């Protein structure tokens, strides 16, 4: 089957790559290859001795990566949460000079109706980043308990009508199992008593189900923890998030790792004991938001936040 060419405009492209502080001979990871915007820019800044390891769990992204014929570049089909395993297999633990993550769903995934990510286009109710693994959104919604669906909508979509929508989903699936995105969008819209004139009523539900089906927040947390073991001293983390749930995790991680161990005031400890606790693992270098010009050219960039941190010598 021919793969349609869906356009993808990389958000905060230069800023995210600048955040890595590229060394020509460095070793870098692009944990979310997508359509290769960040990877291609990183490669353009690497010298002959540099290396780039890219990761993506979307088979379409892996197919796109085959167009890069460069001995410094390699692509792995898998989740970025397993980056420590990929690095360990290549005996590069503690030698990585930078990790870039561009979180969430990409424009090609949203724009391709066959992937089932968008309520704006009718397609199979799938939503998997990797359609070859795990349950689709339709399969999960057909088997999940009403209370579990409500919890997911509330937790990952911050949906105030979560219980009402969950009940409507379960009732509809009892009558006729939903298999299409349009069906889910219609059920959610009908179950939503108060409409936001600036937002489709299914927006939060689709976000929540997608995050749950792909274990997105757990993936982020695991990747962040793994980064501490794989980064070299001075290595950079450059992470773009697109909604508050993602950014909250990244912000909390960078803040906690920048503070070092917290010792209660007045607790008697020797200098040797304090040393054993270790110091700060990261140094937070701040955050960036897209400028007005970028948002005008690419409205999806509006909610993006780039956070950068550097591995310390601790």
From Swiss-Prot:
First-tier enzyme category under EC = transferase
What protein name applies here? Ribosomal RNA small subunit methyltransferase H
**Major localization listed first in the record, in broad terms:** cytoplasm
Which protein family is named in the record? Belongs to the methyltransferase superfamily. RsmH family.
Cellular compartment(s) = Cytoplasm
Organism equals: Citrobacter koseri (strain ATCC BAA-895 / CDC 4225-83 / SGSC4696)
GO BP field: rRNA base methylation
**Which chemical reaction does it catalyze?**
cytidine(1402) in 16S rRNA + S-adenosyl-L-methionine = N(4)-methylcytidine(1402) in 16S rRNA + S-adenosyl-L-homocysteine + H(+)
Is Phosphoprotein given among the entry's keywords?
Answer: no
């Amino acid at each position: 089957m021919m793969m349609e060419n869906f356009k993808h405009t990389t958000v905060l492209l230069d800023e995210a790559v600048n955040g890595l502080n590229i060394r020509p001979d460095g070793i870098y990871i692009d944990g979310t290859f997508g359509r290769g915007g960040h990877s291609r820019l990183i490669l353009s800044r690497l010298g002959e001795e540099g290396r780039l390891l890219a990761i993506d769990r979307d088979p379409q992204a892996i197919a796109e990566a085959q167009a890069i014929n460069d001995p410094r570049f390699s692509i792995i089909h898998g989740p970025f949460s397993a980056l420590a395993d990929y690095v360990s297999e290549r005996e590069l633990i503690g030698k990585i000079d930078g990790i870039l993550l561009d979180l969430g769903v990409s424009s090609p995934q949203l724009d391709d109706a066959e992937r089932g990510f968008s309520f704006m286009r009718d397609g199979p109710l799938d939503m998997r980043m990797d359609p070859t693994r795990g349950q689709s959104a339709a399969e999960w919604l057909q088997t999940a308990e009403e209370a579990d669906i409500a919890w997911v909508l509330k937790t990952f979509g911050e949906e105030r009508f979560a219980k009402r929508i969950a009940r409507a989903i379960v009732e509809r699936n009892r009558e006729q199992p939903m298999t299409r995105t349009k069906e889910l969008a219609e059920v959610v819209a009908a179950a939503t008593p108060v409409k936001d004139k600036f937002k489709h009523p299914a927006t939060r539900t689709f976000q929540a189900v997608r995050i749950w089906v792909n274990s997105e927040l757990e993936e982020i947390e695991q990747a962040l923890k793994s980064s501490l073991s794989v980064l070299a001293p001075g290595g950079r983390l450059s992470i773009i998030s697109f909604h508050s749930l993602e950014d909250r995790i990244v912000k909390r991680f960078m803040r906690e790792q920048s503070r070092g161990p917290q010792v209660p005031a007045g607790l008697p400890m020797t200098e040797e004991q304090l040393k054993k606790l270790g110091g700060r693992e990261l140094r937070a270098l701040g955050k960036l938001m897209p400028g007005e010009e970028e948002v005008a050219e690419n409205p999806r960039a509006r909610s993006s936040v780039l956070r950068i941190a550097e591995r310390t010598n601790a």
